[in-house]
A protein has these predicted regions:
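Solvent-exposed beta-hairpin/edge-strand motifs
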Residues: 497-512
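Surface-exposed beta-strand/loop patches in extracellular or lumenal glycoproteins
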Residues: 255, 486-500
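Bacterial lipoprotein signal-peptidase II cleavage site
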Residues: 18-25
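Acidic/aromatic-lined carbohydrate-recognition and catalytic surfaces
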Residues: 18, 33-223, 227, 231, ...
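C-terminal beta-strand-rich structural cap/linker in extracellular carbohydrate-active enzymes
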Residues: 518-539
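Substrate-binding cleft/loops of secretory-pathway carbohydrate-active enzymes
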Residues: 153-163, 279-312, 383-392
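Loop/helix patches that line or flank the sugar-binding groove of alpha-linked glycan CAZymes
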Residues: 50, 54, 270, 277, ...
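C-terminal motif of bacterial Sec signal peptides marking the signal peptidase cleavage site
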Residues: 14-16
Length: 539
């Protein structure tokens, strides 16, 4: 029997055995419950329009609500993102990660999903998404979607059904207890929430109940949802909160063995489509989830703080950067900040607006191994909003122009306050300035695109000496040499392990001399203060 039919029968049964009748003595009317779209979705791979290993070119994270408003309602939308695709292409990234675009209860960040197969009404329609995907592919850009498997919205039809009675067809889709479990504390609070039919598990918020992923029909439904989007041509997913998928007790609610197994299963599904990519968010165990048996790519939490601290000149962080990729997969997703305040403020605010150090941070993660993720506006040095705090301060309208009313984001009043530095740090102002952050990001991404060793090569000979980091990137016959001086004074980098007698031709910045290795593969290079140098071994 289909789930909707089961629910209808259950509602009638509850009404018949009912209780609480009115003065007329007749049975109460049947409970009206929303339907749940559980239609199976078979795989129908449309193929891939992208080159192999496309993700290593870099991915721009976009908060759709805050990127570009196309229809004058003060809220960003999918059509607005489509309008800005030429800008994204010219930035030099290879793909876009869209923060949640599905219908949600929160109508803001989108992580309280109320419909997994429909687009948020303010963002547009499925047709708008199809247009965005097609236009992105025409420009060589991929599109990955945010997917929330851990929890749904409280208003999701499955949870409305699940919470209707202590026994129903969707009860096991969520985590329930008849009595209030004790001894639990997650994120400083009790994760169990009271409802009329019991207690449900919702550590993030009462409005975001956790799915019961031990329930096979729930997992099968999620897989159908993934195929729904993959069949439309999206190029992969970013999976939210994968460390929270299963709980085995008050002291065992994060990064449980079942989490890794399920994500490995999901990876197999995504990998069944040509040339797709997935990345997972798991701050508690990035390396575990980044392993091939699980997600095969995860955000490198911890590394991102080393990048920022190295840019500040902290030598301990410089040393950590020299060793990180010796022990982790090259598929780890690197970043300096994102949409969550727990990952840090906007990079501009973390570095106090120091442009030289900002460029060092950018060069560090854009030239090292990994899949680099750039948070929208990072490339122009957007700050947070002075009038806001927490996550909202990080999710402001994109600063396209210096217009004090809307920063070029909308013809109407924007849904949220602008970034504090929108008047100075905006695309229009920086476009024509060769020294601006925007053009520095373009240059670093162009280097990564021009030299495959910088995108996908090994990282060898990494050495940290005080505030100077040096390493080689090698892929096949191509080898690049990178030297970064995070210090406030020029310093010599003593290099070894180079190809004997080889010439290393300067690629960045202009005006730097070439380097020639000795017969034993050694060289010494003086790096100016707060500078990145890039060389390419001559063929």
């Amino acid at each position: 029997m289909k789930a909707q039919g089961m629910l209808g029968a259950l509602a009638l049964a509850l009404a018949a055995c009912g209780g609480g009748g009115g003065t007329g003595g007749g049975p109460p009317p049947p409970v009206s419950l929303p339907s749940v779209d559980t239609a199976p979705v078979p795989a129908a791979d449309p193929g891939s329009a992208l080159p192999a290993n496309w993700q290593y070119g870099g991915i721009l994270e976009i908060y759709v609500r805050g990127y570009q408003d196309s229809d004058g309602d003060g809220v960003g939308d999918l059509a607005g993102v489509t309008q800005r695709l030429d800008y994204v292409r010219d930035l030099g990234v290879s793909a876009i990660w869209l923060m949640p675009i599905t219908q949600s209860q929160d109508h803001d960040h989108g992580y309280a999903v109320s419909n997994y197969r429909e687009v948020e009404t303010q963002y547009g329609s499925l047709a708008d998404l199809d247009t965005l995907v097609a236009q992105a592919h025409a420009r060589g850009l991929g599109i990955i979607l945010d997917y929330v498997m851990n929890h749904s919205a409280q208003t999701h039809p499955a949870f409305v059904n699940s919470s209707n009675a202590a026994s129903n067809a969707f009860r096991d889709w969520y985590v329930w207890s008849s009595a209030h479990p004790t001894g639990w504390s997650i994120y400083g609070g009790d994760p169990w929430r009271s409802a009329s039919t019991g207690w449900y598990f919702a550590p993030f918020s009462a409005t975001m109940p956790d799915f019961n992923l031990r329930n096979a029909p729930t997992v099968a439904w999620h897989k159908d949802n993934l195929r729904f989007w993959l069949n439309r041509g999206v190029d992969g997913f970013r999976f939210d909160a994968v460390g929270n998928l299963f709980e085995n007790g008050p002291g065992a609610w994060e990064a449980q063995p079942e989490n890794y197994a399920l994500m490995g299963d999901v990876r197999a599904l995504v990998g069944g489509y040509a040339n797709r990519y997935m990345v997972c968010e798991a701050p508690a165990d990035p390396l575990g989830f980044g392993a091939g048996a699980a997600c095969a790519s995860a955000f490198a939490f911890g590394h991102h703080t080393d990048v920022v601290n190295a840019a500040k000149g902290q030598t301990g962080a410089v040393a950590a950067l020299a060793t990180y990729f010796a022990a982790v997969p090259a598929s780890m997703a690197t970043m300096v900040s994102n949409h969550d305040s727990f990952a840090g403020a906007r990079l501009w605010d973390q570095l106090g607006g120091d442009v030289a150090r900002y460029k060092l941070a950018a060069a560090t993660y854009l030239l090292q191994p990994g899949v680099p993720f750039i948070y929208y506006g990072e490339e122009i040095g957007m700050s947070g909003a002075a009038s806001l705090s927490g996550d909202a301060a990080l999710r402001t309208p994109m600063s396209w122009t210096a217009n004090p009313a809307n920063a070029g984001f909308s013809s109407a009043t924007p849904f949220r306050a602008l970034s504090a530095n929108a008047a100075t740090n905006n695309v229009a102002t920086e476009q024509g300035d060769p020294n601006a952050l925007l053009n520095f990001y373009r240059s670093m991404l162009a280097l990564r695109r021009a030299h495959a060793s910088l995108a996908r090569g090994s990282m060898d000979g990494a050495s940290a000496s005080g505030a100077v980091l040096s390493y080689r990137r090698t892929l096949g016959a191509e080898q690049t040499l990178v030297i970064v001086n995070y210090g406030s004074a020029s310093a010599a980098a003593s290099l070894s392990g180079l190809t004997a007698n080889a010439s290393y031709l300067a690629q960045w910045p202009s005006g730097v001399g070439d380097v020639t290795a000795s017969g034993s593969g050694d060289a010494s290079v003086v790096a100016p203060a707060q500078t990145v140098l890039v060389f390419l071994r001559a063929p």
